[in-house]
Structure formats: structure tokens, C-alpha cells
Amino acid sequence: MYMATPKRQRAGAVLVLHSWWGLNDFFRRLCDRFADQGFVALAPDLYDGRVAVTVAEAQALRATVTASRKEPAYKYLMRMIVELRGAAAVDDIGVVGCSMGGHWAYWLAQRPDLPIVATVTFYAARDGDYSQSRSSFLAHFAEADEWVSTAGIKRLHRSLTKAGRAFEFHTYPGTGHWFFEDDRADAFQPEAAVLAWRRTLDFLKQRMG
């Protein structure tokens, strides 16, 4: 795991969930950026220190780690939530997840026993029962995404609407999957990333302030 703590007054606590590349430098820097804004940020390491660079490596790594984990990923994530709450001395937290991490963020946010009041996802959609969720949602989508279907986004929209949850969806023109991750040279879109970051901070501060 990686944790970053603010030097000034704290704004809250954020669990940062990495994409299928693993806990790489981008997600460590993302934690640092949250800390600069006053948040205690903790990024669990779902791959036990291993990272991937190519899609093929990521697919293989995810499959290998999933099959070999001694502690199920969901139990590990819930344990990390306990650790984050203790480190930040807070009751409620926010969750931010990219791609695979976004799927985990939605799964966690559905659980009424978890202290999640704000959920932010990048290029991820997961249908489910959100009727017992305590969270509000902010979802960032790419305009052209080969990994997230329009149908999947519509299903998520229906699920959140049916559950009466507060949510915002934003789609960024001219972007594809991983547009927020500045280490993905083939996908990173600086202008969209800046706008998504600003919206993310505003959302978290409003929900956790």
C-alpha cells in the first residue's frame, strides 16, 4: 500500500484504487496530489508490489494475482478502509477508482456497512443494487471507450436512479480509456484530466467537508 498525508489542515480521507496496471508511480503521485489538497490518501496494492506496462501484461497479472491471493481482495480492501479511517481519525471516507479500481469502488459503495459517502470513478461502470448505499457518485467517462460500453453506462444510470442516489456523470470529448493517467502516453488527455481533477476535488470537498 501507499499512504500520503497532508501537511496542513485535513479535508478528509480518500481510498485510491488503482487500475489493472497495479500500484504504479501514477497512483502514488495521485495520492500525493490528494494530500496536497488536504486529504489523507491511501492506495491499497492489489498486486502485491507487481506492476504491468502493456495490456497483455496487465491481463496476465490480474489473472495470476486473483488466483494466488491468500486473502481475498474484498477482505483486503475492507481492512485498508479500517486502516485509512484510523490514520485520518475520521468516520466517513471517499473512494476514487480508475478502470478496474472503479469497479471495486462501485462494489464497495453498495455496502451499507462501509463508511463511504463519496465515490469517484474514471472510465468504469458497474450495475448493481445501490439502494442501501450511503454514497453519492461522480463518474468520469471517455467519449470513445473500447472497455466501457454505452449500455453499461445506461445500466449504471438506471441503477443509481432507481436507488435514489445522488450522482453526476461527465463524458469527455475526444478521449479514450485511461485519459486521466498521465503515464499512458497513448491515451492521456491533459485538458480533460485537468477538468476531471477539478470536478473530483470539488465533489469530494462538498461531500466530505
Task: Please tell me what each predicted stretch does.
Residues M1-A88, F179-E181:
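Serine-hydrolase catalytic machinery in alpha/beta-hydrolase-like enzymes
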Residues L30, S149-S159:
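Short alpha-helix in the alpha/beta-hydrolase fold that links the catalytic acid
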Residues A87-C98:
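Alpha/beta-hydrolase fold nucleophile elbow
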Residues V117, Q132-F137, A163-A166:
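Short, proline-enriched alpha-helix->beta-strand connector loops that line the catalytic pocket
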